[in-house]
Amino acid sequence: MKKNILLVGMLVLLLMFVSACSGTASKGSSSDSASEKTEMRTYKSPKGNVNIPAHPKRIVTDFYAGELLSVGANVVGSGSWSFDNPFLKSKLKNVKDVGDPISVEKVMELQPDLIVVMNEENVDKLKKIAPTVVIPYNTAKNVEDTVSMFGDIAGAKDQAKSFMADFNKKAEAAKKKIAGVIDKDATFGIYENTDKGEFWVFNDNGGRGGQAVYNALGLKAPEKIEQDVIKKGEMKQLSQEVIPEYAADYMFITDYNPKGESKTLDKLENSSIWKNLDAVKHNRVFINDFDSFYPYDPISVSKQVDIITDMLIKRAEENKK
């Protein structure tokens, strides 16, 4: 009888101990849950204030993969065009293609905590999935502004500073390399030939190597391009007859020929107007790969600095022969 009473007493004490432990664990779990709650902040975007995660962990974008990756952000989905960029391919291995324009359904599947877009199509639907920041085309004017802006959006200001320190170091080294192979008064132009036979001249912030040439390397544009194109922040289509007015000592041309079937560049190069350009006569025309020179995200611009520097040095050596 005494043994039974003793056993019952021990059982009661055991149950009380388990209950107490359970209560403590429950409180701890509740505390952990509270600490894991996402910290939010207000971001002042060009389109108004947006409440976004202070440190987003899953970002989807249509156009800004390179900008976000440059500051170490975790991009889980990106627009289709990003995957054509040779400088981003290795960084996009685990990133999902969400289409172009981006598919609301594909974005939803990725469960992002932040969406960053240039294109406002379907933006109201995207806002229902996650906080959505709209950054219009040409909001930032150079690499430094771009990196600073996306470092802020991604809660990665330290990474942004680190990227810019490396970028500026590279740009200064590149300037020293080319100083001995180009004349200090030489002019540089950025152009594009299309499969439709259009010929465009570009500014310092429209891709095609403009940021690398004018901003990073500090090279000069002809006065005509400076006044009519760069200062106006525009691209300008040129008729063949006026190309000489916008010609530079060095001409970088992207050839937009997506199907590889267009002969418009051949036609241009065989024209008397083209053959009489000083850049052509002195072998200072560079035909550049469209996919490599179209983008102007910080990672791509950094790579373009390397390519352009190497091209100028190599061509100078060739022209000595």
From Swiss-Prot:
Q: Where is the lipid attached (N-palmitoyl cysteine)?
A: 21
Gene Ontology terms: biological process: iron coordination entity transport
InterPro entries given for it? ABC_transptr_periplasmic_BD, Bact_iron-sidero_bind
Question: From which domain of life does this come?
Answer: Bacteria
Q: Where is the lipid attached (S-diacylglycerol cysteine)?
A: 21
Residue stretches of biased makeup (Low complexity): 24-33
Q: Indicate how the chain sits in the lipid bilayer.
A: Lipid-anchor; Peripheral membrane protein
Q: Keyword annotations for this protein? A: Cell membrane, Ion transport, Iron, Iron transport, Lipoprotein, Membrane, Palmitate, Signal, Transport
One GO cellular component assignment for this chain's record is:
plasma membrane
Q: Where is the signal peptide?
A: 1-20
Where located?
Answer: Cell membrane; Membrane raft
Where the record annotates domain Fe/B12 periplasmic-binding, the positions are: 58-316
Annotated region described as Disordered, given as residue ranges: 24-48
Q: What's the main place this protein lives? A: membrane
Instruction: Spell out the CDD domains in the cross-references.
Output: FeuA (cd01138)
Function recorded in the entry:
Part of the ABC transporter complex FhuCBGD involved in iron(3+)-hydroxamate import. Binds the iron(3+)-hydroxamate complex and transfers it to the membrane-bound permease. Partially required for the transport of desferrioxamine.
Q: Which family does it belong to?
A: Belongs to the bacterial solute-binding protein 8 family.
Relate the assembly described in the record. Answer: The complex is composed of an ATP-binding protein (FhuC), two transmembrane proteins (FhuB and FhuG) and a solute-binding protein (FhuD or YxeB).
**UniProt protein name:** Iron(3+)-hydroxamate-binding protein YxeB
